[in-house]
UniProtKB/Swiss-Prot annotation:
Record motif 'HIGH' region, residues: 43-53
Family from the record: Belongs to the class-I aminoacyl-tRNA synthetase family. ValS type 1 subfamily.
HAMAP family membership: Val_tRNA_synth_type1
Name of protein: Valine--tRNA ligase
Motif 'KMSKS' region, chain ranges: 586-590
Subunit structure: Monomer.
Coiled coil (residue ranges): 914-978
GO molecular function: aminoacyl-tRNA deacylase activity; ATP binding; valine-tRNA ligase activity
Chain positions recorded as ATP binding sites: K589
Lineage of source species: Bacteria, Pseudomonadati, Pseudomonadota, Gammaproteobacteria, Lysobacterales
Localization of this protein: Cytoplasm
Pfam families linked to this entry: Anticodon_1, tRNA-synt_1, Val_tRNA-synt_C
UniProt EC number: 6.1.1.9
Amino acid sequence: MTTLASSYDPSSFESRLYAQWEAAGYFVPSGKGEPYTVLLPPPNVTGTLHMGHAFQQTLMDALVRYHRMRGYDTLWQVGTDHAGIATEMVVSRNLALEGKGQTRDSLGREGFIAKVWEWKAESGDTIERQMRRLGTSSDWSRSTFTMDPQPSAAVNEAFVRWYEQGLIYRGQRLVNWDPVLKTAISDLEVENVEEDGFLWSIRYPLADGVSYEHVEHDADGNETLRETRDYLVVATTRPETMLGDTAVMVHPEDARYLTLHDARIVLPLTGRHVPVITDDYVDRAFGTGVVKVTPAHDFNDYQVGERHNLPLVNLFTVDAKIIDPREQYPDDEYPVVDQGIDWRELNQVQRRRTGQHFAYSIPSAYVGLDRYEARKLVLAHLEDEGRLVETKPHKLQVPRGDRTGQVIEPYLTDQWFVKMDALAKRGLELVESGQIKFVPPNWINTYRHWMENIQDWCISRQLWWGHRIPAWFDEAGTCYVGHDEAEVRAKHGLGADVALHQDSDVLETWFSSQLWPFSTLGWPDAQAMAERGFARYLPSSVLVTGFDIIFFWVARMIMATDSFTGQVPFRDVYITGLIRDAQGQKMSKSKGNVLDPLDIIDGISIEDLVAKRTHGLMQPRMAEKIEKATRKEFPDGIIVHGADALRFTIAALATHGRDIKFDLGRAEGYKNFCNKLWNATRFVLMNTEGARFTGVPQPRTEAEKWILARLDKATAETHAHYANYRFDLLAQSLYEFAWNAFCDWFVELAKPALNNQDADAAASTRHTLLYVLESLLRLLHPLTPFVTEELWQQVAPRLGITTATISLQSFPQPGDVDTSSYATAEADVEWLKSMVSALRRVRSELNVPPSKQVRLLLQADTADDRPRVARLASQLSFLLKLERIDWLDAGQDTPPSAAAIVGELTLLVPLEGLVDMDAERTRLDKEIKRVEGEIAKCNGKLGSATFVQNAPAAVVEQERARLNDWTTQLTGLREQRAKI
């Protein structure tokens, strides 16, 4: 008796099986065979598993399990990223919730970092526990945290080497600044959001008594205005930054302003004189064609300022309040503003003298105001002075921090940078030479664009949590870089009397993440490298990641790995699309459309789902709308699907497109697939009680040969789809074989043999059932590890297999069974399937009870049909409940019958005693209409020049053959219709 449960319930065995796998050490690299390494993009230690993680990790796990079963020495390197900004925010929020009055600042640097480590010890492994629930077969003993001692040593080594090579420098540049976090952030952490704003037009008076002839024209070129003006009109969306303007700019070929080149304007509200400069950057058609230039608070203006040597005027404090510039300088170094000095020359002098950007007096009314309060006051003062010309609505692209939601400020600060030109050139060579392959290949274009337009990389962050920059300063500001302070003192001969303080900044997390391919393998410590298999597992085989971090992570790993090890980090880069909801919308907390993969796996009630989606919203007013939409979409919550159903869904959706729409209905369908597999296994087990077989079956029936040939084909397709990273086609191929070929057809076709008097045929059929099922379970295992393991444990012993787990079984190979002589059997069974389908459709349409036997008449056969009927008569009779089969001669009169056509063979079921004639006429009319529709489809394709000229010749020929078959069927159906 089988001990397999009567129904499929994934919650009853998935967690149990995973615990067994992990305890047995099945995921640990074997050290034998060709190495196959996969790198997990390290998720934030603060994070929880989301659909993007589940999507990529499912594909990675399938690749790892597939190669493990093929005998590869598999290493799936996992770990977590320390996530500087995110972690500081989480711990700061937890401190507030504790209600003890402790804050980041009150604890101080050392105290706060201690709190972070406490939090990490308590909650830092959440995402790894969730990954286990998904079924990830990674070696957890190798799990690495980017702040662990080994990767931290790698970070210091990398920084020191690049600094000594002249690739790392400290300088003053414009960066993305979050005024809430008070740190620079990367472009990836900035979301550009379209918002409603305003465009203000302001009069800037010309200095030195200069005026010009202003002329305006209508759309037809007719002059509409001519007047003498002593001012320019400048349009801006940020009037508060005019306090930091150091020029206004016109296009050098703009005829309206040719007389004003090198003139000066008087900056409103400040009285300072700034130059009118010319630059091709100006769009003459936008507004008045006059642009204000604020190099310290706009990235484009910064580039203009570099070209024209303009001063850099910083307006803001670190929390985006208007600054008192005197705070930036010692009293004896504060620059004296003289309206007669050319600001561009003064800037050169000032930089040489202090190494600082230019500072100046700001009207005291604005000092200390938040930037938006300052905006209101600036506009009020401009209105009072008659300088505000126009205010009109304007759509803006507003840069907001993805964590704080605050508007990001382009901000001028002292930061650490990496020179990227030489590194990027080499990184591009490695890809274009084919040493690294992108899949799909079109992503090379994105990679190339970024590498050819690269800028120096800002690597410093104004945080406490992270890898502190290994640089020390003496009281004179001299910088020393080394692995630690002792090394710095020894290297530079600095005694104990020389006070040193370490740079307070930390490195951004991408700096440590770029070292992931080799820091996890022990670099730079020789002993650790030997222990962790540096020489064996680098380069890794494939990186599975999203297109959004091709530049931020993929490119940097390529450059860093080459720079520090002389190798590529990986051979293949498989770029996945972005998971969206069923309507194509990005999943986000604010939209209330996030699906938690664990809720899909284990289920969730509607009340808990609503609570999860409405808790902690940045916009609480959205809660009611989100609750309403959630209750409408999931009135009963989300049912238990199990990890296998989710994994198979993910594989089926993994096209090579940019966006992937996740439909929960697909997951329910694939849960049914797992259930179908479960029930088919129960059938096989119940019909093979006491059986013990070994080796490859020796088929006695055509059905066995057919299924073995189909198995061989499915196996070959499986290998091809893995090689090409076509998980969608892989899922489609396996689904088709498992559901249709095995569960629907072979299980059905096996029944006549199992119930036959021929003991040899019955035995071989039992062997084939077990053999094909066991092979199918191995084919499916990388995608659906849990259900296949649970079923395989029951099936394997009946084939003499005694190993403990399917996960270490060999993966099926094409040619495991020699099917080269099975062509006739394949054709016979395909014909049999057509016969069964046609006759079952007739029985269904006539409402003939399944148990009632019918007579079958055959007519208009080909030379192959009679021998086939003779060979397959017992199967036909068993499957179709036939009383008998009779042949009619060509042209012989037939009784009123229900008809179907298979190839050129006419199938007739006499109607006497079965149905009334009116019902049969209706059925035939319906069938004729269906076949006419199929003929129309074929004619549509064959009538298309595009299809005929561009489709492969075999496909076109197949379509012509289909048209011929449908036409033959239509002729037979019309003849039968005419008879009744």
